[in-house]
């Protein structure tokens, strides 16, 4: 047997809050896509720099890169 709604009182309506009203302009550009590549090159460059940073940290942790004048001891 299927469920049947008798009246519309069970439907929830969203209430408007001050925070929602103040944040609404930030979401006004939702769904709009700028033509072209946009900031993809900047994002790729940033990801490459982050990968270099992570590899340097990994090499220091594995002691494959020794820094002069800085004692590296994990004891």
UniProtKB/Swiss-Prot annotation:
Q: List the residue ranges forming a coiled coil, or say none.
A: none
Q: Among the entry's GO cellular component annotations, what is one? A: photosystem II
The protein's UniProt keywords, in alphabetical order, are: Chloroplast, Membrane, Phosphoprotein, Photosynthesis, Photosystem II, Plastid, Thylakoid, Transmembrane, Transmembrane helix
- Coarse class of the primary localization is plastid
Report if keyword Phosphoprotein is assigned.
yes
At the top level, the lineage of the source is Eukaryota
> Which residues does the record list as Phosphothreonine (modified residue)?
3, 5
One Gene Ontology MF term:
phosphate ion binding
Per the record, membrane topology reads: Single-pass membrane protein
From the UniProt annotation, give the residues forming the signal peptide: none
Query: What does UniProt say on post-translational modification here?
Result: Phosphorylation is a light-dependent reaction catalyzed by a membrane-bound kinase; phosphorylation occurs on Thr residue(s) in the N-terminus of the protein.
UniProt GO BP: photosynthesis; protein stabilization
**Cellular localisation:** Plastid, Chloroplast thylakoid membrane
Q: Which family does it belong to?
A: Belongs to the PsbH family.
Q: Provide the assembly information.
A: PSII is composed of 1 copy each of membrane proteins PsbA, PsbB, PsbC, PsbD, PsbE, PsbF, PsbH, PsbI, PsbJ, PsbK, PsbL, PsbM, PsbT, PsbX, PsbY, PsbZ, Psb30/Ycf12, at least 3 peripheral proteins of the oxygen-evolving complex and a large number of cofactors. It forms dimeric complexes.
Q: Which protein, by its recorded name, is this?
A: Photosystem II reaction center protein H
Give the species this sequence originates from. Answer: Pinus koraiensis
Taxonomic lineage = Eukaryota, Viridiplantae, Streptophyta, Embryophyta, Tracheophyta
């Amino acid at each position: 047997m299927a469920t049947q709604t008798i009246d519309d009182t069970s439907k929830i309506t969203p209430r408007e809050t001050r925070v929602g009203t103040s944040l609404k302009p930030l979401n006004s550009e939702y769904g709009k896509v700028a033509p072209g590549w946009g900031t993809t090159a900047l994002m790729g460059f940033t990801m490459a720099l982050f990968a270099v940073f992570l590899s340097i940290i990994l090499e220091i942790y594995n002691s494959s890169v020794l820094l002069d004048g800085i004692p590296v001891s994990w004891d």
